[in-house]
Each structure stands twice: as structure tokens, then as C-alpha cells.
């Protein structure tokens, strides 16, 4: 299962952590995903959605 939002396609991002002594260490940032039941094409389906999509109302939740 890929750590990607199925609504906005937000995924893993890589970059550097920079310490006070200016050392650079590679790391990754992963999106804050939730597995929710949502209405997709008229049927309820479990999808991975980032919390920004949930808060902004881009996902119609299935109850």
C-alpha cells in the first residue's frame, strides 16, 4: 500500500535536515493519511485520504 492520498495524490517528499553545525542529513516526510470509508462513484469504498482533504471537504464520507 503506497503512502499516497487518493484524492490529491500527495505523497512522500524527501529533503535535508540541517543541524546547527550545518550538517545535512537526508530524510523523508510522509503525508498525514487516514483510511476512511468514502463515497466513490456512488458506492462506499475504503480509501487513503490526507487530513487536509478531509478538513477541506473534498471527500464525502460514508456512514
UniProtKB/Swiss-Prot annotation:
One of its GO terms (molecular function) is structural constituent of ribosome. InterPro entries: Bacterial_rp_bL28 (IPR050096), Ribosomal_bL28 (IPR026569), Ribosomal_bL28/bL31-like_sf (IPR034704), Ribosomal_bL28_bact-type (IPR001383), Ribosomal_bL28_sf (IPR037147). GO terms for biological process: translation. Keywords: Ribonucleoprotein, Ribosomal protein. It comes from the Bacteria. One of its GO terms (cellular component) is ribonucleoprotein complex. NCBIfam families: L28 (TIGR00009). HAMAP family: Ribosomal_bL28 (MF_00373). Belongs to the bacterial ribosomal protein bL28 family. PANTHER family: 50S RIBOSOMAL PROTEIN L28, LARGE RIBOSOMAL SUBUNIT PROTEIN BL28A. This is Large ribosomal subunit protein bL28.
Amino acid at each position: 500500500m503506497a503512502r499516497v492520498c487518493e484524492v490529491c495524490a500527495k505523497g512522500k517528499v524527501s529533503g535535508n535536515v540541517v543541524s546547527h553545525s550545518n550538517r545535512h542529513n537526508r530524510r523523508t516526510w510522509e503525508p498525514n493519511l487516514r483510511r476512511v470509508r468514502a463515497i466513490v462513484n456512488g458506492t462506499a469504498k475504503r480509501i487513503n485520504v490526507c487530513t487536509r482533504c478531509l478538513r477541506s471537504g473534498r471527500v464525502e464520507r460514508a456512514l
